Structures are given as C-alpha cells and as structure tokens.
C-alpha cells in the first residue's frame, strides 16, 4: 500500500511544485495568447481553464521528463536526488500520478470547442516526445519551445474559433524564448551532460553560447515589436519590451563567466521577462 501522507512531499517534488518558476515560464505565453485573442477581455471560463491546464500539464511534463531521465539523472550531480532517480518514488507511482494529471487536463480541455481539443492532442504528443530527444539531437530546446508555446494556438482556437496569422507570429516569438532560457539552464550541467551523452543547445553552441543567446533574445524582442506594430499596441506594450530588453542584458551580464549559479540566476530571471511582456499586453488593452 502507498502511504500518501508519507509520499506526498516526494510527489510534490516530482511535479516540481517546490520550483514554481517553471509553472510561470509555461504560464506567461499562455496568458499572452489568452489576452491578445480576447482583445484584453478574456472570459473567466477560458482564463481559468488555461491557467489550471498550464499548472497541470507542467506537472505532468516533469513526471515524463524524470521518467525518461531516471537512469541518466543518477550520474548528474544536480539531478541525482530527484525522486525517481533516488528511488523515493517508484515508476508505478509516477505513472499513476501522471495518469491522474492527464485525466484532469483532458477533463479541462473537453470544456472547450472541438478545434481546441484536437490541438490539445498534438500538444500532449509534443510534451511526451520532448524528454527523449536529448539523446538524439542537440536541439531539444527547440522542441521544448514548440511544446511550451502550443497553448498559443489553443488559446486562439478556444477564443475565436480559429488560429489566425497573428497567433502564429506570437507563437514564433514564444518558441524562441524557451531556447534562450533552457540554453542558460543547460549551461549549468554542460560538463556532466557531455559525460553521459545528453545533447543540448548549450553543447551545440559551445563557446558561442552567449552570442547565440543574444541573437535569440534579439529575435524574440524584434518579433514582439512586429506583433505590437501589426496589432497597433500603444506605448505600454513597448515599455514592457524595453524592460524585457533590460532584463535580457542583465542575463548576459550574469552568464558572462558561465558559472552554474549565475546561469541558474539568469534562467530564473526569465520569469520577469515573461511578466513584463504580459504587463505590457495587459496595460495596452486598458488604455
């Protein structure tokens, strides 16, 4: 028998509820899309469904990731004490928890229209495949960007019944952003990853990592600027982008020596990038 009271702290760690920054990194693109699709006035129902769905799917994604990496995590100092790698949670427990979370997510999406449900199926497949890609390609961060941003076409489908061109422009910007912060994150484990055969953009970029991150950051802001021009957003949106630019410059300062604690700080700082872009979107629809 599973002792839920005893195991609950381990389950929460498995779902990364002890590290909520990941929830927000998934949530910000969702909120960008929900607010833009609804022209600043989303329905309460859609907002709640997408917020709850982001939290649930992030937790489910963490379980899949740890299941895929459970044998590799034992050899990486930062991850060797994760619940599945350390044995504090069994594979059976993890799969049961994943099934419960998937059922919750499926129930939520059934409250939306058919197109959104169809897109959700694709989103689930994207999330399931991602953890296994790091064994075969140096671009798992690109797939992560697609998976993390798939809520954008879903939000437009749920709100307006189709996915317009502007949704794909927002999607493009959102896909590039996780490549930025997950490359910063991968810089932490680069030496260990090389030893165990894990691939990442941090390894692919090598000594050009800061340059490539900078180019990606610039591309994110440029695409958002184009989006703002196309939608005729006011100065509040561009002020939000200006703050985001300042934060990205600070991230470049943090990773200048490529020290793991500083790379992790840069990764976490992206939460504020997402927040200020959302704040700009929120305020541009209030004025």
UniProtKB/Swiss-Prot annotation:
It catalyses: all-trans-octaprenyl diphosphate + 4-hydroxybenzoate = 4-hydroxy-3-(all-trans-octaprenyl)benzoate + diphosphate. It is found in: Cell inner membrane. Its cofactor is Mg(2+). Keywords: Cell inner membrane, Cell membrane, Magnesium, Membrane, Transferase, Transmembrane, Transmembrane helix, Ubiquinone biosynthesis. The keyword Membrane applies. Belongs to the UbiA prenyltransferase family. HAMAP family: UbiA. This is 4-hydroxybenzoate octaprenyltransferase.
